[in-house]
Amino acid sequence: MKIVADENLAFTDYFFSEFGEIQHRAGRLLTAHDVSDAEALLVRSVTKVNQALIEHSQLKFVGSATIGTDHLDISALQQQDILWSNAPGCNAQAVAEYVITALYHLDSDVFERGQDFTLGIIGLGNVGRRLAKMAALLGWNVIGCDPFVQLPDIHNLSFDDVLQKSDAISVHVPLTHSGSHPTFHLFDQHAFASMPASTILINSARGPVIEEQALIQDIYQTGRKVVLDVFEHEPVISEQLLDVVNLVTPHIAGYSLEGKARGTQMIYDAFCKVFGYEASKKFETQLPVCEPFFQQQDLKQILKAHLRAIYDIAQDDHNLRACVKDGQVDQCAFDQLRKEYPLRREWAAHGGPVA
């Protein structure tokens, strides 16, 4: 069996080498020729799996080690009788920890504010729910907005109410262009006009959920603090945008070792089910032991003392800004940052809590 895999997927050799030949490819550059004689394709969100890519292939299975599926043309896969799977929730814990780290980077007193700090969460799926639980451990007031989810322990308000009542807003929605609640340009000039100037905005979901030019104008007018891990025109990222945003990272919010390994594990499990193999391997056996930072009882004090050692988010910001060339981020350098990213560990690896 020939298996084509994105070169940046974690542990592909460990999980898949026993099944046949693995060809590692740059996901953004994958072509129809690359997959023409493959039976399985393993991708990330940078690969657009569409009719042009798969129509002349022998593919029987496509696995995407991602939460989202907007890069997969589901109807095209179904027309070709190609089974597919993604990895919902694989890096949800990592993203939740990223958001908390970003907030602490912007406000070193945020852990002391307790119920006086209101975190608004847009989208209460795998990531949003985990973030809400982690925020509750820190004593924050949590409100949310999700027309498709009702959770008994989260105040689910209207979108406008969350915009108006939050000290910080974190976005965790899929990218959708149709339906009753499309998320494309959910944050436009009207949304920004509803938000107090002091409200922090964090987007680690999908770039086009925020209208970039409206965001830039809002920051000019309000001085709003903003954190972006995703960008509307990614991998095209303008220097104009970077100049006004407080914290930028190269689409790595979910890049923990556990998150990436878990994503590959999930598509491995699906692969085995499709092809009739026993799924006997577990990613946990491949992870090294970490220093146990969380040995005390006071979570806030532990985070204040060790959060930077666990994840230095400022370094990611510096590295992305260093990729600017001729007015925008160099796309090759952007992809290289992600390819060579030193995967951080989730708090649980250090003895910390899991949502």
UniProtKB/Swiss-Prot annotation:
Q: What are the annotated GO cellular component locations?
A: cytosol
Compartments (UniProt record): Cytoplasm
Give GO terms: molecular function aspect only: 4-phosphoerythronate dehydrogenase activity; NAD binding; protein dimerization activity
Q: Name one GO biological process term.
A: pyridoxine biosynthetic process
Residues annotated as binding NAD(+) are: D146, D229, G254
Q: Which HAMAP family match?
A: PdxB
| The family this protein is said to belong to | Belongs to the D-isomer specific 2-hydroxyacid dehydrogenase family. PdxB subfamily.
- Under what name is this protein listed? Erythronate-4-phosphate dehydrogenase
Report the source organism. Acinetobacter baylyi (strain ATCC 33305 / BD413 / ADP1)
